[in-house]
């Protein structure tokens, strides 16, 4: 009888050791997976914050660019309607035929192509300035963290 008790006790001890090892193995896995989950959650939260920051930055500079374009279009419409004038440093050649007097020369004016180029340049300058400002802010707020 004592031999059967010894065998049963040995089997029970082996089962307890095996179960202890299995529980410890699954516990270690659970701890590892929890750490990975926490790290992934932290990374996702950081990415979402960065996405919100970039979206806010994009919205702000897109609005500035749209405002600049609206200002240029308003200026173009005002100049076309005669409400505003472009100043140009120019001279008008005097007419050599006939008597000279006040108002003989025409007022200096840009050609249609030059006026169009002026608006394109203004628009390009505003667009590039807005893009540079956006990229500088993006680098400061996102890349240098």
UniProtKB/Swiss-Prot annotation:
GO biological process, one term: viral release from host cell by cytolysis
Keyword Disulfide bond: yes
Compartments where located: Host cell inner membrane
Keyword Disulfide bond included in the entry's annotation: yes
Matching InterPro entries: I-spanin
Positions in the Cytoplasmic compartment: 1-3
UniProt keyword terms in alphabetical order: Cytolysis, Disulfide bond, Host cell inner membrane, Host cell lysis by virus, Host cell membrane, Host membrane, Membrane, Signal-anchor, Transmembrane, Transmembrane helix, Viral release from host cell
Pfam families reported in the protein's UniProt record: Phage_lysis
Membrane-spanning parts: 4-24
Positions on the Periplasmic side per record topology: 25-145
GO CC annotations on file: host cell plasma membrane; membrane
Bilayer topology annotation: Single-pass type II membrane protein
Coiled coil: none
Task of the protein: Component of the spanin complex that disrupts the host outer membrane and participates in cell lysis during virus exit. The spanin complex conducts the final step in host lysis by disrupting the outer membrane after holin and endolysin action have permeabilized the inner membrane and degraded the host peptidoglycans. Host outer membrane disruption is due to local fusion between the inner and outer membrane performed by the spanin complex.
Family to which this protein belongs: Belongs to the Lambdavirus i-spanin family.
Quaternary structure (record): Homodimer; disulfide-linked. Interacts (via C-terminus) with the spanin outer lipoprotein subunit (via C-terminus). Part of the spanin complex which spans the entire periplasmic space. The spanin complex is composed of one homodimer of the i-spanin linked by intermolecular disulfide bonds involving two Cys residues and one homodimer of the o-spanin covalently linked by an intermolecular disulfide bond involving one Cys.
Protein name as annotated: Spanin, inner membrane subunit
Organism: Salmonella phage P22 (Bacteriophage P22)
Gene (UniProt): 15
């Amino acid at each position: 009888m004592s031999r059967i008790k010894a065998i049963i006790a040995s089997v029970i001890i082996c089962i307890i050791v095996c179960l202890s090892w299995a529980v410890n193995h699954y516990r270690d896995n659970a701890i590892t997976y929890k750490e990975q989950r926490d790290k992934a959650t932290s990374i996702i939260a950081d990415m979402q914050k960065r996405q919100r920051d970039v979206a806010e930055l994009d919205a702000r500079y897109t609005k500035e660019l749209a405002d600049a374009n609206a200002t240029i279009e308003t200026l173009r419409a005002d100049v076309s309607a005669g409400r505003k004038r472009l100043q140009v440093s120019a001279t008008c050649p005097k007419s050599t035929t006939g008597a000279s007097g006040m108002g003989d020369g025409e007022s200096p004016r840009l050609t249609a192509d030059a006026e169009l180029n002026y608006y394109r340049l203004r628009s390009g300058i505003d667009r590039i300035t807005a893009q540079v400002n956006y990229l500088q802010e993006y680098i400061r707020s996102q890349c240098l963290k």
